[in-house]
């Protein structure tokens, strides 16, 4: 296969999406998920351009704390300096490019390169060079510090952007999606959350966009997670026979098209979306008996109900899911290749919550979200099988039109209650308009990046034969 030039890439990306509202057509090309060269463009024009989730501030609470992360293809160190300020530094020595630290986290005021012992402070400044006498007198350490990206935090959630020329703030990027971070953070009387010790990291044999779709897919719940639904129903029967109540979320109604349940979704600018539903038995949530009265008193009944009586899957496109439902989970998406994705799963909770609430949160997390839980393995199988199915090139298109005749493009009672302005609203948990927003943003970012590349370079594709004729 020959490499595409810029114009050919623009045509390809333009042709990957077929949205014709007047005809009720909403479909995407499956080769969005199967092109190795496209993956490199996605890394350059999406993951190395927009704000990408890096870590939570609770993971680096002290001066000189750090974690190592991957932003697109770039190895990064996210650190606090000696004054507590945040930095996002490329984890590569300015001398010959070796990584400075090879551990996941720690506390260091100085990073010493294991290769040639150049030393950098936790704010990225180069402070020492081994055997400096062989360098010229004008060798300037102050100009050789670690390259840094933009870094910002919203209510403890730390994001990095490698586009140092961009002017958009993190809050601009998040937009109305911030409200759904607030709904979790506000459950804490101190306004602080914390990532719990330990995390799971796993890979699946599929494209990164599959995970972004799946976390917003209410349609698959009652089929793919049937075993979990059945298990919960069995627990309910056993507990009822003992006179006890169910101690986990009653998942049985989700995704079954129950018209009595207030559910649906919002899609926002920049590709963000949230899937929500009434929670059948909200009193099983960690700390419910103390958190709910606190929220009602401080924020009012409606906002308290949104925080504690509704489950929410928030996708901050393209790199993070914040699940506040069966338990509370951060699901970080890290693309590895066009057909391989790493997911990092962490439990996040209210800082200072009671030991009983914390125990409940962890048990509920392990039950469904953990790698060995009853939910995650089901989804990973479907990612793998979708990626296999996409090789069936006779059919190019996937349909994402479910419920299009009921999508709303103006205010609803729910959006007014929350003070938000979604670009699309769905009134049913299983409708697929969230993907229209998600993949529309994918196309916008790629095309915008390609157009900017076209302005910066003159793209020439040589015909080998004509060149030889001239020789």
Swiss-Prot record:
Residues 52-160 form the Rieske domain. PROSITE patterns: RIESKE, RING_HYDROXYL_ALPHA. Pfam families: Rieske (PF00355), Ring_hydroxyl_A (PF00848). The keyword Oxidoreductase applies. [2Fe-2S] cluster binds at residues 93, 95, 113, 116. It catalyses: anthranilate + NADH + O2 + 3 H(+) = catechol + NH4(+) + CO2 + NAD(+); anthranilate + NADPH + O2 + 3 H(+) = catechol + NH4(+) + CO2 + NADP(+). Binds 1 Fe cation per subunit. Induction: By anthranilate. It comes from the Bacteria. Changing residue 217 to E: Loss of dioxygenase activity and lack of iron at the mononuclear site. Fe cation binds at residues 220, 225, 379. Pathway: Aromatic compound metabolism; anthranilate degradation via hydroxylation; catechol from anthranilate: step 1/1. The anthranilate dioxygenase (AntDO) multicomponent enzyme system is composed of an oxygenase component and a NADH:acceptor reductase component (AntC). The oxygenase component is a heterohexamer of 3 large (AntA) and 3 small (AntB) subunits. Component of anthranilate dioxygenase multicomponent enzyme system which catalyzes the incorporation of both atoms of molecular oxygen into anthranilate to form catechol. This is Anthranilate 1,2-dioxygenase large subunit.
